[in-house]
Amino acid sequence: MNTGDTPCKTSLRVTTWVDRSLHHLKLQTEFCMNMANRSHSQYHITPQDHDEDARGYLLNEPPAHGYDHDRLGVGTPPDRPVSAYSLTESYAPNASQLPPAGSGGFGDNGFGQYGQPQGFGGPYDRPLSAVHDEEESWMQRQQQPGGVGQAGGLRRYNTRKVKLVQGSVLSIDYPVPSAIKNAVQPRYRDVEGGNEEFMKMRYTAATCDPNDFTLKNGYDLRPRMYNRHTELLIAITYYNEDKVLLSRTLHGVMQNIRDIVNLKKSTFWNKGGPAWQKIVVCLVFDGIEKADKNTLDVLATVGVYQDGVIKKDVDGKETVAHIFEYTSQLSVTPSQQLIRPTGDSPQNLPPVQFIFCLKQKNSKKINSHRWLFNAFGRILNPEVTILIDAGTKPSPRSLLALWEGFYNDKDLGGACGEIHAMLGKGGKKLFNPLVAVQNFEYKISNILDKPLESSFGYVSVLPGAFSAYRFRAIMGRPLEQYFHGDHTLSKILGKKGIDGMNIFKKNMFLAEDRILCFELVAKAGQKWHLTYIKAAKGETDVPEGAAEFISQRRRWLNGSFAASLYSLMHFGRLYKSGHNIVRMFFLHIQVIYNVLNVIFSWFSLASYYLTTTVIMDLVGTPVVASSSAAEHHGWPFGDTATPIINALLKYLYLAFVILQFILALGNRPKGSKFTYIASFMVFGLIQGYILVLSGYLVARAFQQPISEQIKLDSSEDFVRSFFSGSSAGGVILIALITIYGLYFVASFLYLDPWHMFHSFPYYMLLMSTYINILMVYAFNNWHDVSWGTKGSDKAEALPSANVTKSEKNEVVVEEIEKEQEDIDSQFEQTVRRALAPFKEVEEIEKKDVEDSYKSFRTGLVVSWLFSNILLVVIITSDNFNSFGIGKSASVRTANFFKFLLYATAALSIVRFIGFLWFLGKTGLMCCFARR
């Protein structure tokens, strides 16, 4: 048989870990002949009639003739050729290709629907559709089988006794489903035949603080156990993102690892062992309570997680983190397609070493980083650690570009890539002004801000969503200072921890990544610097609603402001570093630049208001011709109406600024969503009006030829006329060039100008809201620092690991040992859930009672305050002269005081009459009262 380079060759390789019978080889050969002419598309192939065997294999359903009984257990499928079959067809709910429930070889073994044991006392004794609550369904799946089933009947499982490491550390290897281990390419199984890396998943219940997760205490990780050098540790931090966001990040990371493994001319990766063995991917989930349980199904499909494994405590000692380890070649795309290897194609994903850390309680992102650096980092000792937030999608070869920055610069301590907003298919999200504004903000930061700071050698913030650090550079003081913000260390650190911090320091740790950046550059005796790497790109979601946008920026603005002051106050520590005189010179320039930025930020509220009013006055106030000024008429509504409209807009501007203070001091953004949307609209309309007036002002300034305004006779005349002449031409030219021109020039030089056309107009309209709404809310909520650990009711219902003594007086845990067919059957359920089409649940905001009370209070205060302000303005302002309520402000003031005096007198007379009536009535009653 000569089929060329087909999957048949791969399937017929003799593996070292199993002895296949000749009968199986014959079946595989026949199957391969049918598969030889099929397309090798990686993602999807329309199922044909002869795909039935492949579909049955992927579903772990044996053929009618059954399988030989080998050491992998009854019903284990033979090693089939790897196809490009899309498991969405097989596992999607109500798929037409599915066989009837209970059919196949498993039905002969007493298995009922979906191949589950009859009478099984767990969540599988009824269809999952009956379990409406996702959380409840997940909790049921964690219970240990083997007891009396709720449906009646008794299912007995074999048990095994697992010895605890050093008498206290529970670490167990669990067999993975057949479909997962059979998906691994034989060439990797051959190489790794001496261990169980692809055969079993390792689970460790960590009952200690991250600082105590050490070899000395009995904890270990597979890459070190296999004596592998970890060059690159890629960390994905997760909070509550859905399975699409997690898959987007995870699949992007695996594709980037493939880029590294496929390097042909590398002088590093192709030496000293396979490249994939030098890379570890670590997922850290911040608590069971907040995690989307569908993401756990995705990880279980990849092989990194299994239901029914985790233990809430070991011998009464609470588990702090559940750690899973497995090496997999599987991935799930954001569109819920399962990616498997196809033959020996270079497009196959290489094996990826996974560490999945599921923290039992929510204890914030900084604690997740403590698990990463202090626990896993100290054991693996990587050269470079890359940090990625779940939801951020790294572009092709981006992780390689980040690593190359460290490889080519021995003094590089940290780096970040370009983060840009996810704009949706065809850029449809740009129709949302908030998304467009943030897109422009990200772009300009990547084009102007990051390159400038990178030139100085100190990037003020390496965003945690997409950045990298040299591990040995941040060890020591940088990490120690960084982790002072971890509230789980408050008891250990005492006054140096969160409990001993003032409100300024607590806000500083809202942007703790800025603290790490400064501490890294200022590290004593070292000359580490930070840089921006243009070739590394990451795509992330941005808030699309006003409430979410405001809440996000509160933390960013307060944290960055406090951290900026921290770096300025501690600038003297740079003199203890090892930077040379040239670097120190540029760092001094940078600190002056940062001081000016802080000052301008502090006075930005007044600056925006003064700019608005000055432009209105320049354009709207009519000017009579004189020897020093030309005649100007009020524009655009004429000499009479323009000043009145401008005055109303000024008052409206002030009113909405005051409204922001009232909202910020008492209301949640989600509780006042529509008020904030109205505020964005009002400030946007006023800013649009100002832009129109500015355009008119520019046109009016250049009515006089520029040659007459700016003298070119000599350099002295040019400087005098340009900067201090009576005309405004020079000043306007400076403004146009620095505000608009530089953005366009820099964007075109960067070869990325498109944001200037689709996002810049939105930014021009809403730029005042960054101060009037975002900064006002942030500063008014300076006290809002949320740190507390949130406990988990879900964790309380998890099973425990009860310790006993063996015959040899060893500390052991008795663990249920499932048969392979049970594992495969439950895996079928898992993949069904993982590959089901994602349906985004629209969050229905229900205003709670407290929000309704706060909204009423806000309305009451606003009505009271603004009505009083309106009265004062009407009485004292000359802008209301033409409304027929008085010839001038002085006349209205006099009339108001007359009215006030007469009204006060009248009310006093009424009170006096009432007094006389009461007095007379009391006297008369005294005379006629009975004694």
Curated annotation (Swiss-Prot):
Species of the source: Metarhizium acridum (strain CQMa 102)
Keyword field: Cell membrane, Cell wall biogenesis/degradation, Glycoprotein, Glycosyltransferase, Membrane, Transferase, Transmembrane, Transmembrane helix, Virulence
CDD domains reported in the protein's UniProt record: Chitin_synth_C
Compartments reported by the entry: Cell membrane
Segments for region (Disordered): 93-154
Single Gene Ontology MF annotation: chitin synthase activity
Catalytic activities: [(1->4)-N-acetyl-beta-D-glucosaminyl](n) + UDP-N-acetyl-alpha-D-glucosamine = [(1->4)-N-acetyl-beta-D-glucosaminyl](n+1) + UDP + H(+)
Phosphoprotein recorded as keyword: no
Name of the protein described by the UniProt record: Chitin synthase III
Stated role: Polymerizes chitin, a structural polymer of the cell wall and septum, by transferring the sugar moiety of UDP-GlcNAc to the non-reducing end of the growing chitin polymer. Contributes to the production of conidia and the ability of fungal conidia to germinate. Involved in the fungal cell wall integrity and the ability of conidia to withstand biophysical pressure. Required for appressorium formation and evasion of insect cellular and/or humoral defenses, promoting the fungal dimorphic transition to the production of hyphal bodies that occurs within hosts, and ultimately to virulence.
Biased composition (Gly residues): 102-122
Top class in the EC scheme: transferase
